[in-house]
Amino acid sequence: MTTLTVKLGERSYPIFIQPSLLTQGNQLADYIKTDKAVLVTNDLVDPLYSQTVIDSLPSIKIEKIVIADGEQHKNLASFEHVITQLLSMSAARDTTLIALGGGVIGDLTGFVAASFQRGMPFIQIPTTLLSQVDSSVGGKTAVNHPLGKNMIGAFYQPKAVFIDTKTLQTLPAKEFSAGMAEVIKYGIIYDKAFFAWLEQNIAQLIAQDVDALQYSIARCCEIKAEIVAIDERESGLRALLNLGHTFGHAIEAEQGYGNWLHGEAVAAGMVLAAKAGQMKGWMSKEEVQRVIALIEAFSLPIAPPANMGYQTFMQHMAHDKKVQAGKLNFIVPKAIGDAVVTSELDETLLRSLLD
């Protein structure tokens, strides 16, 4: 087993990474302080893993809330539904929520945990690659609004993160590829040696080799834990984790949440960001090509939808959370392993990039 720690003083918490971890409830039970917990999951994950988690915790009474699967359900209606269910179950402030699912379930459950009676404990059990390497770690919780992604939310840390790499065996190939976009992101923004390792292990990762998966997930969580410990509330360094997301969120909003997977939109966004880096004279053509080749190797899109140009992007990006003092901030790579936050992408450059 790999055990990491997100170091946030008294709010520090562990990340456990191991195949078949879901069957080992004794460890999970250590983080549930009462004899009652509520499992929040979706209708795809529920028949696959809910009973395994419940059976592994025989001494704890577990109730279940199941919502429909998909990004289109990460909204205030689902948030209200979960709150209503908790109230009808007489959940209390010390009841533990268990988020079992991908990024939508983790983000939604975390936001409910932050809000219900002003804060209740929650545990993340991410079952998709994207949530295992990114959204389950770091305490960003949110739901979407029709005008923008993750517009309503809170910073609220879990008590622990349990990553069972075996859950990836039931993940559709398209979802696995989408998760790889976030894995690649870490190499581009922070670790050129990890990027090179990914280039050398494409076949092993696609085949879901146990050791390759364990290493890549652990390395991503390690990088994220390091960044979050330095900058929990995204005032500086943590913003680098949004590489590809400014463009990506615009693609998701324009296409309708769920029509492009989050990771697919981020992949296309990272290519745009790398090309912007080249246009600024920061990134070499060779490195941009390496980024494109690695993204393509995992069957991910390397360009936005053909119907999206400068005007459409700008219309959505005006609502982006990275707008500060009226200026839109972008995360742009200067080289593989090195990225910056910049507002220096002018209209001429953006038109040339997007039209």
Curated annotation (Swiss-Prot):
Gene3D superfamilies xrefs: 3.40.50.1970, Dehydroquinate synthase-like - alpha domain
Cofactor binding, per record: Binds 1 divalent metal cation per subunit. Can use either Co(2+) or Zn(2+).
Residue sites binding NAD(+) per the record: 69-74, 103-107, 127-128, 140, 149, 167-170
Names of the cofactor(s): Co(2+); Zn(2+); NAD(+)
GO function terms (MF aspect): 3-dehydroquinate synthase activity; metal ion binding; nucleotide binding
Protein known as: 3-dehydroquinate synthase
Enzyme class: lyase
Associated pathway: Metabolic intermediate biosynthesis; chorismate biosynthesis; chorismate from D-erythrose 4-phosphate and phosphoenolpyruvate: step 2/7
Organism encoding this protein: Pseudoalteromonas atlantica (strain T6c / ATCC BAA-1087)
Gene Ontology cellular component annotations, sorted alphabetically: cytoplasm
Catalytic reactions on record: 7-phospho-2-dehydro-3-deoxy-D-arabino-heptonate = 3-dehydroquinate + phosphate
Entry keyword set: Amino-acid biosynthesis, Aromatic amino acid biosynthesis, Cobalt, Cytoplasm, Lyase, Metal-binding, NAD, Nucleotide-binding, Zinc
